From Swiss-Prot:
<feature type="transmembrane region" description="Helical">
    <location>
        <begin position="378"/>
        <end position="398"/>
    </location>
</feature>
<feature type="transmembrane region" description="Helical">
    <location>
        <begin position="6"/>
        <end position="26"/>
    </location>
</feature>
<dbReference type="GO" id="GO:0030955">
    <property type="term" value="F:potassium ion binding"/>
</dbReference>
<keyword id="KW-0633">Potassium transport</keyword>
<feature type="transmembrane region" description="Helical">
    <location>
        <begin position="526"/>
        <end position="546"/>
    </location>
</feature>
<feature type="transmembrane region" description="Helical">
    <location>
        <begin position="419"/>
        <end position="439"/>
    </location>
</feature>
<keyword id="KW-1133">Transmembrane helix</keyword>
<feature type="transmembrane region" description="Helical">
    <location>
        <begin position="483"/>
        <end position="503"/>
    </location>
</feature>
<dbReference type="GO" id="GO:0005886">
    <property type="term" value="C:plasma membrane"/>
</dbReference>
<feature type="transmembrane region" description="Helical">
    <location>
        <begin position="176"/>
        <end position="196"/>
    </location>
</feature>
<dbReference type="Pfam" id="PF03814">
    <property type="entry name" value="KdpA"/>
</dbReference>
<keyword id="KW-0472">Membrane</keyword>
<dbReference type="GO" id="GO:0008556">
    <property type="term" value="F:P-type potassium transmembrane transporter activity"/>
</dbReference>
<keyword id="KW-0630">Potassium</keyword>
<feature type="transmembrane region" description="Helical">
    <location>
        <begin position="249"/>
        <end position="269"/>
    </location>
</feature>
<comment type="subunit">
    <text>The system is composed of three essential subunits: KdpA, KdpB and KdpC.</text>
</comment>
<comment type="similarity">
    <text>Belongs to the KdpA family.</text>
</comment>
Length: 556
């Protein structure tokens, strides 16, 4: 069997598994966010933090809850990293001395679900920081994204109310009822597949292929690896991330990790359909996501298997930066999944992808990561795209646009348009400033188009809360740590505030009955329109920069 055939089978089994779990997991999440029953552990947490689980919040109060929780999380994680040398389970290594700028960058990175890492995990973060700091944020940052998505769905589903639910209840339920149970099962499977789970610091001795002994730090890897993928976080315990055999030992654990990356994102549209009382609407959103996912993955595999470039042509495969235990096709599927979501984990070196393969990873992030996108953020991003699509369709036929019985008035379209202006503004401004500063240009390992691609990739990844990188960029500097930290913060919280404002505006409306002129939003035509609007918006925004970077490199 050729590697191409094996890769296609790998992808087909993955898609089939996602289809199988779409309805049961989506229905389960629907019940989690709509039930009135609280678990005993949840009631205890509510008492400890002083929350009335039956009270609801306006969009402003919900947004303040998100911002307050995230701000406290950033401060806690920032301090934890700086004092880790005085805590148990720290690394006895000079490299563990975090600079304030790196601690800031890392704290913002994990709280915003980005997991950009300007450091080597196994030599910088002690086990206590990994567990009590980074792993905890992997859970709660994903739960924040799901909570915001559910709040927007409630905005569509509710009529003439200013309330969107309770952020603290949604946060706790998402963590305890969805992320934690799946993570427990996934961690056991990873350990069974060979991932490590221990508290060793520097005494994990392995034998290399050459027969010599090598000491590699151990740690609680499997428990962090599973939520890293499930919560679309992406930060690796090791610098090599999911290419490291202690994190991702075999081809089937590689498949499992890709499945974990995609499973919640592709199941949330079912939750959306159930909550608005029309499952067909959920299928339409899932179809847009699936179409873009398959299109992107197909192009990624094509570009990687075409042997484009001098070295791939000479050796017969684009194997630079690729683990032999995975191969080119499986690594291509992983690269597409990790950049179509907000994960950013890698099982190969993205800087070593073919020029056009690297362009696909950037384009995936520039789509807004909506196919299926980050945990929660993918759904609310796609719903904002649906709002823009019905607005465009309404202009074409001269009718006031409507979506799910809600009129898309000037306020709603301004909020939706602002949502999609935030990220390009951050990406293009940050890239332009970095390229204008000689000191920051010196951080590029390559000149010419690929050097530009490294910087563009960094700001694209940070602003879209992805966290992957073209590793040729030396990003652990005062300027990059600060600038990318700001890009991550603004790229996360400005869109969230705009989404919640949109949800509040929609929730206050009544319901407009369908008429003969209402655009059907559950049919294939609408699926095609949303996909088309997504591609056009991205192409008009980023094509000039892509032409100067990866496209120019590919033509050369």
């Amino acid at each position: 069997m050729s590697s191409t055939t094996a890769g296609l089978i790998f992808l087909a089994v993955l898609v089939a598994a996602l289809v199988v779990v779409h309805v049961p997991l989506g229905d389960y999440m629907f019940r989690v966010y709509t039930t009135d029953r609280d678990l005993a552990a949840e009631r205890t947490i509510y008492r400890l933090i002083g929350v009335d689980a039956r009270s609801e919040q306006t969009w402003g109060a919900y947004a303040r809850g998100v911002l307050a929780f995230s701000s406290v999380s950033i401060i806690f994680l920032f301090v934890l990293q700086l004092v880790q040398g005085k805590l148990p389970l720290h690394l006895h290594d000079p490299a563990t001395k975090m600079t304030p700028s790196l601690a800031w960058n890392t704290a913002v990175s994990f709280v915003t679900n980005t997991n950009w890492q300007a450091y080597s995990g196994e030599t910088t973060q002690g086990h206590l920081v990994q567990m009590a700091g980074l792993a905890v944020q992997n859970f709660v940052s994903a739960a924040v994204g799901m909570a915001v998505a559910v709040a927007l769905v409630r905005g569509f589903a509710r009529r003439r109310t200013g309330e969107l639910g309770n952020f603290w209840v949604d946060l706790v339920r998402g963590t305890l009822r969805i992320l934690l149970p799946i993570s427990i099962v996934g961690a056991v499977l990873l350990v069974a597949g060979g991932a490590i789970q221990n508290f060793h610091l520097h005494d994990q001795v392995v034998t290399t292929l050459g027969g010599t002994a090598q000491t590699i730090p151990g740690g609680p890897v499997a428990s962090q690896e599973v939520i890293k993928e499930l919560g679309t976080n992406g930060g690796g315990f090791y610098n090599a991330n999911s290419a490291h055999p202690f994190e991702n030992p075999t081809a089937w654990t590689n498949w499992l990790e890709i499945f974990l990356i995609l499973v919640i994102g592709f199941s949330l549209p079912r939750t959306f359909g159930r909550m608005v009382g029309n499952p067909k609407q959920g299928y339409a959103i899932a179809s847009v996501m699936a179409s873009l996912y398959l299109l992107s993955t197909g192009f990624m595999l094509w570009f990687q298997l075409q042997h484009h470039g001098t070295v791939p042509s000479a050796v017969g495969a684009a194997m630079e930066g690729v683990e032999q235990r995975f191969g080119v096709p499986d690594s291509g599927v992983f690269a597409a999944a990790t950049t179509l979501t907000s994960t950013g984990a890698v099982d190969s070196a993205h800087d070593s992808l073919t020029s056009l393969g690297g362009m696909i990873t950037m384009f995936n992030m520039q789509l807004g990561e909506v196919a299926p996108g980050g945990t929660g953020s993918g759904l609310y991003g796609m719903l904002v795209l649906a709002v823009i699509t019905v607005f465009v369709a309404g202009l074409m036929v001269g009718r006031t646009p409507e979506y799910l019985g809600k009129k898309i008035n000037p306020r709603e379209i301004k909020l939706a348009a602002s949502y999609f202006l935030v990220t390009p503004l951050i990406v293009l401004t940050g890239t332009a400033i970095a390229m204008a500063l000689p000191g920051e240009r010196a951080g590029m390992a390559n000149s010419g188009p690929h050097g530009l691609s490294e910087v563009l990739y960094a700001f694209t990844s940070a602003a879209n809360n992805n966290g992957s990188a073209f590793a040729g960029l030396s990003a652990n500097t005062e300027w990059y740590n600060t600038a990318l930290g700001l890009a991550m913060a603004f790229g996360r919280f400005l869109p969230i505030v705009l989404v919640l404002a949109l949800a509040g505006s929609l929730a206050r409306q009544g319901s407009t009955p369908d008429s003969a002129g209402t655009l059907p939003t559950h049919r294939p035509q609408f699926v095609g329109m949303v996909a088309g609007v997504t591609l056009i918006v991205v192409a008009l925004t980023f094509l000039p920069m892509l032409a100067l970077g990866p496209l120019a490199e590919g033509i050369h």
